[in-house]
């Protein structure tokens, strides 16, 4: 959520920034929120005048009573003033509700570093690692490799549940578990993150806090009876861990890593990478989340991105890092990098992680603040997160980049200790 004071003082700048985003945003709502804000402030002035008058009148009552004078007129005036204040308070509550409704639907403002552009084709490659994998045979797609090795079963998952679900079997299940354990061990032991195992269901307030709601409710799996949501990413519960709290400045940055299953309806994604493991309704992911002081956040974003890159380097999977343009930035991020792995069957790079700085956008929605010391005024933290990284897509990238002509798959060296020393799946 944006700072209303920032909108008030820089409305034209805000409108221009919002106009440059991918989804054309109706900037007239900025004028609407400013009009409501002005109305609210005018009413507050009136309320303060009325309260001052009521206090002045009420202070006269004891003295007049002591003198034996009739105070019925003054009491009646006090009652009228209180009723008038009550009416204004009700109006203010309605105005606040309208302002909140609009503010929750205004996207974040892109950082000046974000490049211009309208689609993902305008994203800028920052760096890459390893050349795309070459084969002297026609490489197979990971869904064919997994099916032929009897380690992935899409057909039976379709029977049991529906499309875009998977059974991992035998060494496929073990490979998935190995990747999860390797990622968690790397981020906790080498990168200094504290591990969190979060709930897989959250309430509506949590989804609003991280920006999934109200805009993306159609993409969420909802348990209507309790108004709970299955998490689309561990970012939601881990960020909301500190909702409505004031952190200590010397604790920052806080660094958490969380493994979780993730659940997404992927509404509107029909036909986009829907085969295999790339776009599933349920998938596993290791998430990195940071809470920082504002002046630290962009340095910490670079570190977070490098932490995510480390596991791809150690796995030996070719990848690149792209800086996301304004048109492809999404609702909540101020600046975002995507890590994309090379997928031979696609003959292109596929996103495996998004690393974002939200600045104070989520912190304002979730009311997460910090104080430098006991006497200092609370300030909003900056929140960051990134996949560290998506598990299913990692398994897919391993199957495709490490495949052999005979259909077997070499296990990356760093995963072999988690696979009982096994070197090949065949």
From Swiss-Prot:
L-serine binds at residues 233-235, 287, 387. It catalyses: tRNA(Ser) + L-serine + ATP = L-seryl-tRNA(Ser) + AMP + diphosphate + H(+); tRNA(Sec) + L-serine + ATP = L-seryl-tRNA(Sec) + AMP + diphosphate + H(+). SUPFAM superfamilies: Class II aaRS and biotin synthetases, tRNA-binding arm. Gene3D superfamilies: Bira Bifunctional Protein, Domain 2, Serine-tRNA synthetase, tRNA binding domain. Catalyzes the attachment of serine to tRNA(Ser). Is also able to aminoacylate tRNA(Sec) with serine, to form the misacylated tRNA L-seryl-tRNA(Sec), which will be further converted into selenocysteinyl-tRNA(Sec). Consists of two distinct domains, a catalytic core and a N-terminal extension that is involved in tRNA binding. This is Serine--tRNA ligase. It comes from Clostridium botulinum (strain Okra / Type B1). The lineage of its organism: Bacteria, Bacillati, Bacillota, Clostridia, Eubacteriales.
């Amino acid at each position: 959520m944006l700072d209303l004071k920032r909108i008030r003082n820089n409305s034209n700048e805000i409108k221009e920034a919002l106009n440059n985003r991918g989804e054309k945003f109706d900037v007239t709502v900025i004028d609407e929120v400013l009009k409501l804000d002005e109305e609210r402030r005018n009413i507050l002035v009136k309320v303060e005048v009325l309260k001052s008058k009521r206090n002045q009148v009420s202070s006269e009552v004891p003295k007049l009573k002591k003198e034996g004078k009739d105070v019925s007129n003054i009491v009646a005036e006090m009652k009228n003033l209180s009723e008038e204040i009550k009416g204004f308070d009700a109006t203010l509550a309605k105005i606040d509700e309208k302002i909140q409704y609009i503010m929750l639907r205004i996207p974040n403002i892109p950082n000046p570093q974000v490049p211009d552009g309208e689609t993902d084709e305008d994203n800028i490659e920052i760096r890459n690692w390893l050349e795309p994998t070459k084969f002297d045979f026609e490489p197979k797609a990971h869904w064919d490799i997994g099916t032929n090795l009897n380690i992935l079963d899409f057909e039976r998952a379709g029977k049991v549940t529906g499309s875009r679900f998977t059974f991992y079997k035998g060494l496929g299940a073990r490979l998935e578990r190995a990747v999860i354990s390797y990622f968690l061990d790397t981020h906790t032991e080498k990168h200094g993150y504290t591990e969190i195992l979060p709930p897989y269901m959250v309430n509506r307030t949590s989804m609003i806090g991280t920006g999934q709601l109200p805009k993306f409710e159609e993409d969420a799996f909802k348990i209507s009876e309790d108004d709970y949501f299955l998490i689309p990413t561990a970012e939601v519960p881990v960020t909301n861990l500190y909702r409505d709290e004031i952190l200590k400045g010397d604790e920052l940055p806080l660094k958490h890593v969380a493994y979780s299953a993730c659940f997404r309806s992927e509404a509107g994604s029909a036909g986009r990478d829907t085969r295999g493991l790339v776009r599933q309704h349920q998938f596993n992911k290791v998430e990195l989340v940071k809470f920082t002081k504002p002046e630290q956040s962009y340095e910490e974003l670079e570190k977070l991105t490098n932490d995510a890159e480390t596991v791809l380097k150690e796995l030996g999977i070719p990848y690149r890092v792209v800086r996301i343009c304004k048109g492809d930035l999404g609702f909540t991020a101020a600046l975002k990098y995507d890590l994309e792995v090379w997928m031979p069957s696609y003959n292109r790079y596929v996103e495996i992680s998004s690393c974002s700085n939200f600045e104070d956008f989520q912190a304002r929605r979730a009311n997460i603040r910090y104080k430098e010391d006991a006497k200092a005024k609370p300030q909003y933290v900056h929140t960051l997160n990134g996949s560290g990284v998506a598990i299913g897509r990692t398994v897919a990238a391993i199957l495709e980049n490490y495949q052999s002509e005979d259909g077997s798959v070499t296990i990356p060296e760093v995963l072999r200790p988690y696979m009982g020393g096994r070197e090949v799946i065949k």
